Every structure is written in structure tokens, then in C-alpha cells.
Amino acid sequence: MATNVVSQEQDAIALEVQITAPPDRVFQAITDPSQMLRWWGQQGIYHSTKWCTDVRPGGQWSCHGVSDADGSAYQVSGEYLEVDPPRLLSHTWVASWSGPMKTVVRWELQPTAGGTLVRVNHSGFAGAPAAAKGHYEGWVRVLGWMQAFVETGETVASRPAVSVPKN
């Protein structure tokens, strides 16, 4: 996977990846709960157990899952702010492991000769550098998983497990 770090400032994370698929295919992968359940996660790290999406401005989304390191449950949820298929999606992000912090994720999908340039900007980490670092590491993994799913059909079940130290 060729994820480029555009910037990793204290307040925001920006990454991009080129995917060899059209923007509508990528947009489906990041909005269709049945597809997200298939690719978002990796054995040994965490796995999603339920995704819900109401993809419209003001609509809600949520992901429930389990950490493979310690078996603890997690939830990430938010509200869609902008929805312009298949080129733009933005939503709030509230993660159970980050306390009450509400951040914003913006996906931009730009058609290219080779498929789609995906840009992800996750902002709102002012005063929380550890949270920014953790989310940066997470987004690098997530974009790789999504790219592998869209380009090759790789799923959580078919992806090799990793060994993560238990807490």
C-alpha cells in the first residue's frame, strides 16, 4: 500500500492513497455497512461486529467492535456533515477510547487516470497530541485495509492475523 502522509500536525492528520478503482466503488466501500464490516479490522488488532449508516447530511453512523488485544468492546460514532457521492464525505468522529473528544473526518475522492486518489483529513486534535498520533497510526492501517478490499477483495477473514501484545 502506498499511503502518503500529507501532514501530521498537532490538530490534524492528512493522508492520501491511490486506489485502482473508480470513485463510486470506493464511496460504496466507505458507506455501505455490509462492505465496511468485511474490510475494517484485522485479526489480532480488532474486529468490527456491527456497522450502521444513514448516509445523508444529519444522518448518524456507528461502528461497534472488539479489541483483540484485551477483549474490550469499543464504539465509534458520529453524524454525517457533507455527503456528495461519489466525491466527498465528511462526518464527526467520537471514539469510545478518546473520551468526549469530537473530531471531524473528511474523505475526498478524486478521479484519476489510474482510479481514485483518496484524501482523508481528520481534524480537531488540538491539545491532544497522543490522540492525534494514535489516530494517525490507525488511519494508515484503515486506508491499507480499504485499498486491499477494493482492489483485491481482501477481507478481515482472509487477511493474515497479526500478533499484538496483550495488555
Predicted regions and their residues:
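Hydrophobic pocket/interface hotspot
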Residues: 26-27, 36, 61, 80, ...
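Hydrophobic ligand-binding cavity/cleft-lining segments
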Residues: 1-46, 167
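A conserved amphipathic terminal alpha-helix motif
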Residues: 124-167
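Generic structural detector for well-ordered beta-strands
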Residues: 14-20, 54, 64, 79, ...
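A short, structured loop/turn motif at beta-sheet edges
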Residues: 23-24, 54-57, 81-87, 108-117
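Short coil-to-beta-strand transition motifs
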Residues: 72-77, 101
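Beta-strand/loop substructures that line and gate deep hydrophobic ligand-binding cavities in soluble
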Residues: 16, 88-140
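Short beta-edge strand/loop motif at the mouth of beta-sheet-based domains
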Residues: 14, 34-73, 158-167
